[in-house]
Curated annotation (Swiss-Prot):
Organismal lineage: Archaea, Thermoproteota, Thermoprotei, Sulfolobales, Sulfolobaceae
One function term, GO molecular function aspect: ATP binding
General function of this protein: Catalyzes the attachment of serine to tRNA(Ser). Is also able to aminoacylate tRNA(Sec) with serine, to form the misacylated tRNA L-seryl-tRNA(Sec), which will be further converted into selenocysteinyl-tRNA(Sec).
Pathway the protein contributes to: Aminoacyl-tRNA biosynthesis; selenocysteinyl-tRNA(Sec) biosynthesis; L-seryl-tRNA(Sec) from L-serine and tRNA(Sec): step 1/1
Entry protein name: Serine--tRNA ligase
Keywords noted in UniProt: Aminoacyl-tRNA synthetase, ATP-binding, Cytoplasm, Ligase, Nucleotide-binding, Protein biosynthesis
Subcellular location(s) per record: Cytoplasm
Length: 453
């Protein structure tokens, strides 16, 4: 939940219901939250009244006449017992209320397109020259949704990234990985590993040159923390839990960076605080049983560079645009054609009030595929983690948190394999990566060539 949500529960529950309806989920939790919050505030008044009465009587005992003292002591004990019982009742109501509130998603920004799923998301801009196989032109044009873009027709069918990796280049092995680890794992070799490393260094270099602080975060978080950063009920099919430990593997560096100021206060003049984290990402992908079974697009582990900002409330929307521009700059540097879409309300996830996705065109699949997710979470995470800003005069409020992918290495590799392949199976390396490969004598510099048996 967020402070914004708690304010709406108390002052405008109908508005909160409207936001939740936009997400196409049940609004009955709002009524229960309103009921419990009213009960909590009423009980709090009763606690404060009992506490006041107890304090008045307790302070009068030393001054009382001897014949009155015993009666006052008895009355004080009765009030103390009643107070303790009422405080316990208050705690129980508060816990029940907070459990309900923690299940409520973020509010929704008015600029997010309303719709139950991703088909209602709206493309807002395109970039690059798109390679389109001649038989896929009609399908490509249908995905533009009326927008005009620059594209070229190619007359040979591109090879899908999974076959390029394992059958043409012979630089990956998902079959052996499945044998020893299970589905959605992989071995990568030689040039593809160098490409992975170069992509990570390119993203880090780009972001640190903009003044973002580089972070290597913990790869596991305690239950209390991960439940504050995300809606764990929504993510239970995505997050790995360590058996017999109160620890969860992170699904992105967003999670530990968000927790960097867990239960702390930040001087407002220090905001915004901008970070770029690098980490492995671990995902169960339990909800994607039949999606992307081949290749390395949707896997249980990969490397990721993540942007993250702690912001003052008044600056968060401006910084949301900054984050997506940073991601676009990275993909423009790679020369990968893409579109940015404004995500529909039903596909936002609990944390985000608004989200952009950057999707690269994949010529072999004739589809746009997600490479970047960029969210403004307002104060939803900060309230749950108790991260506040403090003004010089002492006034406090909850910070806003924002996050965006910079690079998810394996997905970006799949985009390079499909967009930079030649008809003879050779893959050109994006020129921007050359400087990150040149220091290593065995690393490829310009091309990745198919391996012979």
């Amino acid at each position: 939940m967020s402070w914004s949500i708690l304010e709406l529960v108390r002052n405008n529950p109908d508005k909160l219901k409207e936001y939740i309806k936009r997400r196409f989920i049940d609004v009955s939790l709002v009524d229960r939250a309103v009921e419990l919050d009213k009960k909590w505030r009423q009980t709090l008044q009763e606690v404060e009244k009992l506490r006041h009465e107890h304090n008045v009587i307790s302070s009068s005992i030393p001054k009382a006449k001897p014949e009155e003292r015993q009666e006052l002591i008895k009355k004080a004990k009765e009030l103390l017992k009643a107070l303790e019982e009422k405080e316990k009742e208050l705690d129980n109501i508060e816990n029940e209320r907070d459990n309900i509130l923690m299940q409520l998603p973020n509010i929704v920004d008015d600029s997010a397109p309303i719709g139950p799923d991703e088909t209602y998301s709206v493309p807002i801009r395109f970039w690059g020259k798109f390679k389109v196989y001649e038989k896929d032109e009609a399908e490509f044009l249908s995905q533009l949704k009326g927008n005009r873009v620059d594209y070229e027709i190619i007359h040979w069918k591109p090879v899908g990234h999974a076959d390029m990796l394992e059958n043409v280049l012979k630089l990956g092995d998902t079959k052996k990985a499945a044998e020893v680890s299970g589905a959605r794992f992989y071995y990568l070799f030689d040039d593809i590993v160098w490409l992975d490393i170069a992509l990570l260094n390119y993203a880090i270099d780009t972001m640190t040159s903009k003044g973002y602080t580089l972070v290597l975060p913990p790869y596991m978080l305690r239950g209390e923390v991960i439940k504050s950063v995300i809606d764990l009920d929504t993510f239970k099919d995505a997050i790995y839990k360590i058996e017999n430990e109160d620890l969860y593997l992170i699904a992105t560096a967003e999670h530990p960076i968000a927790a960097l100021y867990f239960k702390e206060e930040i001087p407002k003049e220090k905001l915004p605080l901008k970070y770029v984290g690098i980490s492995p990402a671990f995902r169960k992908e339990a909800g994607a049983a039949n999606k992307d079974l081949k290749g390395i697009f949707r896997v249980h582990q990969f490397h990721k560079v993540e942007q993250f900002i702690f912001s003052s409330p008044e600056d968060s929307w401006k910084l949301h645009e900054e984050l997506i521009r940073n991601a676009e700059e990275i993909f423009q540097g790679l020369g990968l054609p893409y579109r940015v879409i404004n995500i529909a309300t039903g596909d936002l996830g609990a944390c985000a009030a608004k989200k952009y996705d950057l999707e690269v065109w994949m010529p072999a699949q004739a589809k746009f595929r997600e490479m970047v997710s960029c969210s403004n979470c307002l104060d939803w995470q900060a309230y749950r983690m108790r991260i506040r800003y403090v003004e010089k005069g002492g006034k406090k409020g909850y910070v806003h948190t924002l996050n965006s992918t910079a690079i998810a290495s394996t997905r970006t590799i799949t985009a390079i394999l499909e967009n930079y392949q030649r008809e003879d199976g050779v893959v050109e390396i994006p020129k921007v990566l050359k400087k990150y490969l040149e220091p290593f004598s065995r690393a490829p510099k310009d091309y990745i060539y198919p391996r012979k048996e």
